[in-house]
Amino acid sequence: MKKIIISTFCLLITLVTFAQLPEYVISNEWETSNQQKAEKLMNDWKNLILEMDENAPRTFLLTEMDGNSVYFTQAFESLAKYEAWDKNFNENVRPKVLAKFREMNGENAFEGTNTEFVMGHVFKMRPDLSYVPEGMNLMEELPKHTYRRHVTVDVGWGERSAFEEMQKKQIQNDIKLNNKYITLMLEPVFGGTERGDYVMVILGESRAAYFNGLEERMKKRNADNEWKAMRDAPVGTWIEEESLMITY
């Protein structure tokens, strides 16, 4: 009974915490040979959207640290709201944003950067598989944590339920160990990595701060029998990792 009460309380805390975040993340992936310039130009475009569209969604950039990709990303409460916003933006706002952008950067701003669209991605937030320590204000913490480690997980056929149950157990174990960090779990709706069933987004104030924190967490975990039992019976395989920096 005590475990049921604790689990219910944790679920309520999770729902309240993640109610602050939109449910869907839509990300357009671009590759470029001049990441610094392309990022600057995309940031100009982002800022103009936020400045000129009073209904603009949460909009940010993710820049790959060890590669040449930039992700132009927005978050929406539903796919219907995305479709409504996108239609209104293209019909009524985009021409004004484009005119201002060209005024700032010229007609052929991306010339020489070899910037090419790769594909669009749609992800759904999974609050039940995410972790934000109790008492932490997520919206206040997000701008402080500019580093993102994205881990794509492949789950075998018929093992989704087992993976999700394992993820929940690992979160509860970290709570027991007083490991405090932020992990957001996303589930691909469209796009994503081939064979990727989930994407874990683990936050840090910087890459160095993230790995220092991870080292401390692993010391506690490796001394804990429950954690070691889960470690020795993994569900799912990490198939891709990216280190990115976020720009709001």
Model-derived regions, located:
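Sec-dependent N-terminal signal peptides
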Residues: I6-L11
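Short S/T/G/P-rich N-terminal loop/turn motif that feeds into the first structured element of a domain
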Residues: A19-Y248
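N-terminal signal peptide c-region/cleavage motif recognized by signal peptidases
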Residues: T14-T17
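Positively charged n-region of N-terminal signal peptides that target proteins for export
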Residues: M1-I4
